[in-house]
């Protein structure tokens, strides 16, 4: 009987675990038995999907919010720590911009949110921003850019870590802008950076492109500021908004 179950599971694209559960499950009625078997299959698939999402996300290491220190971190009034931990902003395709000095915990927070999103069954990718640009440039040279952009378009969260650490040439800037523009109001972004908006012209090749990129990032975004640079960064943002 076990072999027959495995055969039917394969034909119906059910997991081999379904056959094991079917052999072990009990129930006073047929309906209770079937409910137990199906519930076990749903649980198995959910765990498998979470693990696959974590594997594909490309995190440097798995981080969580356990023992994370929120002291000296400025969170905007429309967010709470609990909502942040739950990655609640993803439901509205909103963005996070994490700004502060090196070593302040920006990458840790971005990763922890990404891990939580994976645990919720969402598709996430984590990139060092320079690595993403290099991958885009290489894909264009190899004729596979559309394939990469299609892959990115299926995400629910794209994390760009170390934004602005390395300046980009014209091609890299334009390709990164294309990715950000494609995300606009469709999927969420998390950006980690230690560079003020007023200095982003030094990162990207073109001032006009820089302005357009900032506009798309800031709209529907929450600013989370690490350390004591809160006023300076907010002032930089206000100056940009007035232009």
Named regions from a protein language model:
Residues 63-87:
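N-terminal pre-Walker A segment at the start of P-loop NTPase domains
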Residues 109, 113:
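Hydrophobic positions on the alpha1 helix immediately C-terminal to the Walker A/P-loop
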Residues 98-100:
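Hydrophobic anchor at the beta1->P-loop junction of P-loop NTPases
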Residues 103:
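Walker A (P-loop) phosphate-binding loop of P-loop NTPases
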Residues 6-61:
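Interdomain "pre-motor" coupling segment immediately N-terminal to P-loop NTPase/helicase cores
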Residues 106:
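Conserved lysine of the Walker
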């Amino acid at each position: 009987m076990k072999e027959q179950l495995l055969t039917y599971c394969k034909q119906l694209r059910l997991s081999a675990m379904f056959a094991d559960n079917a052999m072990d499950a009990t129930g006073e009625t047929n309906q209770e038995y079937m409910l137990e078997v199906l519930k076990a299959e749903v649980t198995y698939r959910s765990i498998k999907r979470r693990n696959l999402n974590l594997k594909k996300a490309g995190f440097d290491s798995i981080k969580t919010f356990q023992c994370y220190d929120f002291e000296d971190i400025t969170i905007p009034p429309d967010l709470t720590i609990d909502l942040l931990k739950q990655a609640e902003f993803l439901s509205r395709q909103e963005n996070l911009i994490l700004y502060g000095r090196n070593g302040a915990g920006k990458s840790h927070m971005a990763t922890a949110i990404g891990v939580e999103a994976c645990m919720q069954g969402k598709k996430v990718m984590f990139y060092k921003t320079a690595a993403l640009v290099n991958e885009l440039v290489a894909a264009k040279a190899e004729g596979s850019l559309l394939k990469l952009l299609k892959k990115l378009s299926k995400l629910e969260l794209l994390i760009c870590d170390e934004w602005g650490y390395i300046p980009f040439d014209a091609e890299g800037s334009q390709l990164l802008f294309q990715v950000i523009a494609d995300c606009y109001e469709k999927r969420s972004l998390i950006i980690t950076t230690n560079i003020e908006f007023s200095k982003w012209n030094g990162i990207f090749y073109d001032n006009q492109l820089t302005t357009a990129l900032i506009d798309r990032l800031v709209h529907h975004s929450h600013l989370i500021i690490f350390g004591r640079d809160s006023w300076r960064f907010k002032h930089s943002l206000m100056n940009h908004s007035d232009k």
